[in-house]
């Protein structure tokens, strides 16, 4: 009986594929990577210029993908975990369907979205540790999942 219990317990661990971490960038105080957090993997490219430092940088994120749905209404569910402490999930509306700030909000299914989004961390102090952010993109009136990405940030500030 014991071999059966051990086999049934270890079998899922043997055949479970570990999620591949895709490198984002490596700066002087942080390492950024992401992986897919659902089974709907599709080509998605994200790069930062310059690579993000959490001690106060600003720059641009270059994002490129081909949506599987029209982007008339788009929002993100953002779940953040800081050093194993859960922060309440935040819903961030990106495209309302009218009077939108981003040009890609009118993109149709199958059109390539190639956009640049500014970022800034000036004035924000991040404690040392590991940050995880799950960004789940939801589109349309039927609220269909467009994609889900799991970002990992390891912050290792230099102590001088």
From Swiss-Prot:
Q: Where is this region: Interaction with lipopolysaccharide?
A: 119-123
A single GO BP = inflammatory response
| Cysteines paired by S-S bonds | 25-51, 37-148, 95-105
Q: Does the keyword Signal apply?
A: yes
Glycosylated position list: 26, 77, 101, 150
What the entry says about post-translational processing?
Answer: N-glycosylated.
Q: Which InterPro entries match?
A: Ig_E-set, LY96, ML_dom
Return the Gene3D superfamilies for the record: 2.60.40.770
Q: What is the effect of changing residue 95 to Y?
A: In endotoxin nonresponder
Q: Signal sequence span per UniProt?
A: 1-16
> Could you cite one Gene Ontology molecular function of this protein?
Toll-like receptor 4 binding
Q: Which GO terms describe its cellular component?
A: extracellular region; lipopolysaccharide receptor complex; plasma membrane
Q: Keywords, A to Z?
A: Disulfide bond, Glycoprotein, Immunity, Inflammatory response, Innate immunity, Secreted, Signal
Localization of this protein: Secreted, Extracellular space; Secreted
Task: Please describe what this protein does.
Answer: Binds bacterial lipopolysaccharide (LPS). Cooperates with TLR4 in the innate immune response to bacterial lipopolysaccharide (LPS), and with TLR2 in the response to cell wall components from Gram-positive and Gram-negative bacteria. Enhances TLR4-dependent activation of NF-kappa-B. Cells expressing both LY96 and TLR4, but not TLR4 alone, respond to LPS.
What does the subunit section of this Swiss-Prot or TrEMBL entry state?
Heterogeneous homomer formed from homodimers; disulfide-linked. Belongs to the lipopolysaccharide (LPS) receptor, a multi-protein complex containing at least CD14, LY96 and TLR4. Binds to the extracellular domains of TLR2 and TLR4. Ligand binding induces interaction with TLR4 and oligomerization of the complex.
Record-given protein name: Lymphocyte antigen 96
Query: Which species?
Result: Cricetulus griseus
Taxonomic lineage of this organism? Eukaryota, Metazoa, Chordata, Craniata, Vertebrata
What is the primary gene name for this protein? Answer: LY96
């Amino acid at each position: 009986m014991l071999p059966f219990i051990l086999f049934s317990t270890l079998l899922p661990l043997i055949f479970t594929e570990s999620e591949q971490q895709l490198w984002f960038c490596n700066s002087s105080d942080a390492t950024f990577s992401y992986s897919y957090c659902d089974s709907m993997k599709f080509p998605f490219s994200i790069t930062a210029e310059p690579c993000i430092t959490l001690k106060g940088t600003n720059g641009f994120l270059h994002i490129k993908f081909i949506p599987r749905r029209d982007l008339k209404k788009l929002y993100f569910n953002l779940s953040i975990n800081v050093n194993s402490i859960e922060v309440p999930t935040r819903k961030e509306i990106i495209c309302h369907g009218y009077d939108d700030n981003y040009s890609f909000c009118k993109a149709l299914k199958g059109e390539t979205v190639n956009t640049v989004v500014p970022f800034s961390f000036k004035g924000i102090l991040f404690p040392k540790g590991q940050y995880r952010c799950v960004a789940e993109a939801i589109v349309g009136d039927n609220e269909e999942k467009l994609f889900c990405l799991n970002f990992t940030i390891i912050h290792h500030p230099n102590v001088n």
